[in-house]
């Protein structure tokens, strides 16, 4: 069964070809105008409270990477929809529990309910759904006099890429600033180009960028998908936060943690 009359709204600050707003009044108006249609709303934990403030009715809500929902800034909206939506589901590979009543945890059954399904990671590995990682450790060196941290980061990332000899690499940085410094203030990009690599980055502050050119969010993920399926294409994806939650990089061969 397929729904062919769904209207789509995005409630976040990212770029999209669909109608997008973070104003609660506009969310309410949009919902009323499309009352005869099925409505699909995409939002972030940062903007979830805007939907709550709009006062619209939500039938079903899915919380992806739901361990984030226990954060102090997000929990109030999470609790609200848990109690007001007709169906509420939480998905995470890393559930966060709490042993104190002053800090929210996913073991709070009044909000999160009971566990419907839980699969141990070793079982997923054994059945081939998850590939076990092969960890390689690279020792860092101390900064030389007057040397910029970004220059050392660039040297280490290029050395690691050379040693790995992989075509598709994800680099996880600790902040957007670290990514910007690496790309804008070092020889990192030119060193990649010399080796035949393209580069991509996407953050809420910089937007989506491919080889120095700003593109839309949709273009970014279309290219990411195409390059991921091309066995001969060499590229590096830069993103912040561990393992770049929410990004599906097809064909990914290695992850470098820039710390």
Label the model's feature ranges:
Residues 67-130:
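Post-DEXD/H (motif II) to motif III coupling segment of the RecA-like Helicase ATP-binding lobe
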Residues 113-180, 185:
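Conserved interdomain linker/interface between the two RecA-like ATPase lobes of SF2 helicase motors
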Residues 1, 11, 167-175, 202:
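Conserved RecA-like ASCE P-loop NTPase motor core of nucleic-acid helicases/translocases
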Residues 1-26, 190-191:
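Conserved helix-turn-beta segment of the N-terminal RecA-like "Helicase ATP-binding" lobe
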Residues 56-62, 235-239, 245-259:
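A short beta-strand element within the Helicase C-terminal
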Residues 18-34, 196-243:
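Conserved helicase ATPase core of P-loop NTP-dependent helicases/translocases
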Residues 28-77, 239-241:
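Conserved RecA-like ASCE ATPase "motif II neighborhood" in helicase/translocase motors
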């Amino acid at each position: 069964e397929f729904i062919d009359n769904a209207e789509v709204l995005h409630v976040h600050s990212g770029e999209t070809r669909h109608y997008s707003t973070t104003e609660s009044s506009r969310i309410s108006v949009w919902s009323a105008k499309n009352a005869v249609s099925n409505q699909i709303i995409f939002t972030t934990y940062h903007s979830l409270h805007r939907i709550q403030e709009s006062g619209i009715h939500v039938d079903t809500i899915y919380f992806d990477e739901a361990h984030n929902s226990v954060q102090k800034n997000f929990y109030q909206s999470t609790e609200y929809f848990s109690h007001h939506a007709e169906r509420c589901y939480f998905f995470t590979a890393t559930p966060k529990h709490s042993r104190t009543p002053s800090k929210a945890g996913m073991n709070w059954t009044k909000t999160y309910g009971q566990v419907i399904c839980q699969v141990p990671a070793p079982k997923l590995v054994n059945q081939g759904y998850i590939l076990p990682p092969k960890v390689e450790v690279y020792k860092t060196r101390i900064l030389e006099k007057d040397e910029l941290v970004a220059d050392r980061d660039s040297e280490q990332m290029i050395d690691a890429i050379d040693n790995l000899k992989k075509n598709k690499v994800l680099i996880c940085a600790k902040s957007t600033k670290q990514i910007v410094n690496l790309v804008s203030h070092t020889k990192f990009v030119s060193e990649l180009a010399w080796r035949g690599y393209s580069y991509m980055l996407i953050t809420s502050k910089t937007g989506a960028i491919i080889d120095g050119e700003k593109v839309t969010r949709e273009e970014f993920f279309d290219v990411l998908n195409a390059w991921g399926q091309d066995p001969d294409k060499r590229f590096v994806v830069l993103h912040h936060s561990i393992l770049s939650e929410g990004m599906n990089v097809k064909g990914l061969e290695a992850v470098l943690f820039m710390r």
